[in-house]
């Protein structure tokens, strides 16, 4: 039964492939995201830029706020829990959330263990900086992987770094002889079966999205170019001058990332982008949480 549920959740996540998932804090924002063509929304009380600016401990959002967003849209709704916080995940499952993101954006509840996601019916999303992290989260039951990037910055450099690292490691593993996969699994600290899957198929066994710092249609197209199968956009939309227009442009750019002429048109007159933070100005590196 567990295997069947795991396969079902992975298939559900595959249905989001090629789409854009947007952070929203109100039902109105959720409707803007849905109208723009988002394949799902991430419900949270504060977008990552505000979480970073406010500091302090950040926790799961109020279930009443999440329910308001669930009622406002017909597309899937995701919500975040702290790394390792089993009770928060149970609460989200109880309110019938569509996906749970065990997220480094929130303050970690456990600095050693992640949630055993196989104990839940709802599919989980997890972040990763490299292939080892991704496969460890998948072994725990994650149905979807995203780059960690550096959320709330508007700077895409870490998402690029994480996606390039992951795709390079996948290529390297796929190129090994069969009898070298055991040693590779040991070095990655992952089960042999998962390493063998990547070796045989040249990809992760789950869908792999980009997240962290995506703020423009060009950013979204870049991440697709580098191997992402979809994009999360957080602060980049509702911290910009024209959220509705920018949201629609990013959705179209993600779906048509090879069309440079269209990308040029989509990038025109979008209003001011979020101000952002350069990588070397960041005080708290969220991507380092939960390896």
Curated annotation (Swiss-Prot):
Pathway it acts in? Cofactor biosynthesis; pyridoxal 5'-phosphate biosynthesis
Q: Which residues form the active site?
A: 80
List, alphabetically, the PROSITE patterns matched. Answer: PDXS_SNZ_1, PDXS_SNZ_2
Q: Which Pfam families match?
A: SOR_SNZ (PF01680)
List the GO biological process terms.
amino acid metabolic process; pyridoxal phosphate biosynthetic process; pyridoxine biosynthetic process
Specify the domain of life of the species encoding this protein.
Bacteria
Keyword terms of this UniProt record: Lyase, Pyridoxal phosphate, Schiff base
Listed under subunit, the entry gives: In the presence of PdxT, forms a dodecamer of heterodimers.
Q: Under what name is this protein listed?
A: Pyridoxal 5'-phosphate synthase subunit PdxS
């Amino acid at each position: 039964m567990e295997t069947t549920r795991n396969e079902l959740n992975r298939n559900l996540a595959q249905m989001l492939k090629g789409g854009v998932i947007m952070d929203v804090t109100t039902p109105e924002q959720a409707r803007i995201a849905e109208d723009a063509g988002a394949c799902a929304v991430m419900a949270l009380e504060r977008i990552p830029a505000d979480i970073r600016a406010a500091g302090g401990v950040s926790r799961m959002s109020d279930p009443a706020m999440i329910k308001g967003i669930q009622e406002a849209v017909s597309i899937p709704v995701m919500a975040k829990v702290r790394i390792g916080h089993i009770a928060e995940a149970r609460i989200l499952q109880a309110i019938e959330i569509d996906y749970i993101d065990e997220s480094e954006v929130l303050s970690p509840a456990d600095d050693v263990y992640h949630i055993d996601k196989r104990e839940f019916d709802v599919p989980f999303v997890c972040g990763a900086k490299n292939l080892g992290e991704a496969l460890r989260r998948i072994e725990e039951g994650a149905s979807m992987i995203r780059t960690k990037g550096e959320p709330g910055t508007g700077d895409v450099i870490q998402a690029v770094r994480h996606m390039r690292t992951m795709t390079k490691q996948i290529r390297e593993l796929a190129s090994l002889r069969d009898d070298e996969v055991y040693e590779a699994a040991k070095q990655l600290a992952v089960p042999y079966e998962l390493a063998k899957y990547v070796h045989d198929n040249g990809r992760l066994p789950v869908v792999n999205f980009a997240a962290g710092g995506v703020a423009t249609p060009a950013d979204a197209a870049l991440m697709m170019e580098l191997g992402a199968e979809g994009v999360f956009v957080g602060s980049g939309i509702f911290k910009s001058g024209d959220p509705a227009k920018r949201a629609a442009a990013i959705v179209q750019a993600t779906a048509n990332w090879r069309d440079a002429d269209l990308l040029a048109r989509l990038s025109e007159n979008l209003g001011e982008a979020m101000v952002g933070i350069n990588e070397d100005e960041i005080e708290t590196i969220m991507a380092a949480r939960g390896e």
